[in-house]
Amino acid sequence: MSHRSDTLPVPSGQRRGRVPRDHSIYTQLLEITLHLQQAMTEHFVQLTSRQGLSLEERRHTEAICEHEALLSRLICRMINLLQSGAASGLELQVPLPSEDSRGDVRYGQRAQLSGQPDPVPQLSDCEAAFVNRDLSIRGIDISVFYQSSFQDYNAYQKDKYHKDKNTLGFINLGTSENKLCMDLMTERLQESDMNCIEDTLLQYPDWRGQPFLREEVARFLTYYCRAPTRLDPENVVVLNGCCSVFCALAMVLCDPGEAFLVPAPFYGGFAFSSRLYAKVELIPVHLESEVTVTNTHPFQLTVDKLEEALLEARLEGKKVRGLVLINPQNPLGDIYSPDSLMKYLEFAKRYNLHVIIDEIYMLSVFDESITFHSILSMKSLPDSNRTHVIWGTSKDFGISGFRFGALYTHNKEVASAVSAFGYLHSISGITQHKLCQLLQNTEWIDKVYLPTNCYRLREAHKYITAELKALEIPFHNRSSGLYVWINLKKYLDPCTFEEERLLYCRFLDNKLLLSRGKTYMCKEPGWFCLIFADELPRLKLAMRRFCDVLQEQKEALIVKQLEDAMRE
């Protein structure tokens, strides 16, 4: 479409070739409105043409969602321009939507047309991003996506519980952090071998990671993953966190719009990481909680389910480039057996899929009768060139603030491409030195840290599960990871994702942060993830708040049932 502003008459007093700002804005607004009209027409054609296709209901729903997303972006641009016009003196304002703690949308008073526009109302961060004329459409998408993903976490960061300074602050049982061995880690990181500052540590590093750290990571993984042969440091790339590694892999293995299969429920941070830069879709392979003839245990992953998900994706025209596995699984805590892993790898090879395996919880197995089997322990892989392993220290060592993640891949091209992201996501030289010293002290890890960490995880898990049993709350009982997957369906009436969200908001209102199943792409509403790897006094207070919320919810359900009965 040509820009009408090119043909507008030039008012006297203005230089030829320049268009008044208000005319330019209205021209852009006209173009967007026409585009919006066209998109709405296509949207309703989709609705009409697919009404009778019951077998294509899912594709129908997804088509609607795509059109609604387009409409949302166009409306966003319109509001952007309208707000820009108001700020520059145009006689135009728009009532801005806001959302309360329950998620209900509120609108301001009707805009008034006047020569002196009313002051722009104070906006939340999310609203400000929505109307910020300085952001591109992509920038608005990123900002809104970030706010919607981390709004509650940011609230927690601003109002953290402290036993002396802030007893009414948020307690976070929603972010997977291990806070049980801070005393051990603080002591270890203050020892003399940690405090080294050399010239090379203050200079730009090898973007793949300092050679001394990559060598130590290769040795560490060879030892703890029980690799049959020594792992090659040249196959190691280190970045500032496992999500950075995953994001880099998504970028180099997929083009925008392509996809990975991921068994769901799965760690929600991967969805954020894959979308932020790479625009890669994660297609959930839904797992059911019910035991059936084909589902011999809850949330069982089978090759049949992978086959079905891949077929559905291809029928919808999606290009699937890989399979993502988390082992031990987050948030379920399941550990895949070597036989199961081999079946998943053979499935991937059959369809030329990459396999990304996140083993970030490999040392957080606290039941001595259970053995974790790393993919790196296998003598041969069906397709070693398409198998990529991620590990980091955030969970097993409880130092998420160090921001360290490592990739191990036999594929030299993948390693080289991921290394490019070290330019943006590298780790400071001093941190790399400390990490190297930490990982190479195998005696301290084996004799001091791991036994203590496993004992404390086991005791914290024992306390939490006893509390859940006393409350008669079902949960997925596993002995790895930092979390328990709990079933709160009985507190939802009806059992929907909207009711799940409202219960989540009730927890927030009582300064308790949990993670709800929807953020893990869980198929069934009512599941929550509860982190137990915290000090006992704080854990006990958190559980008191947890019980208070459930009592409030129970009373609210009784009132609702009575009101429904009276209406009948």
From Swiss-Prot:
Q: Which GO terms describe its molecular function?
A: pyridoxal phosphate binding; transaminase activity
Parts of the chain that traverse the membrane: none
Query: SUPFAM superfamilies this protein is in?
Result: PLP-dependent transferases (SSF53383)
Task: Work out whether the entry's keyword set contains Ribosomal protein.
Answer: no
Sorted UniProt keywords: Pyridoxal phosphate
Family designation? Belongs to the class-I pyridoxal-phosphate-dependent aminotransferase family.
This chain belongs to the protein called Probable inactive 1-aminocyclopropane-1-carboxylate synthase-like protein 2
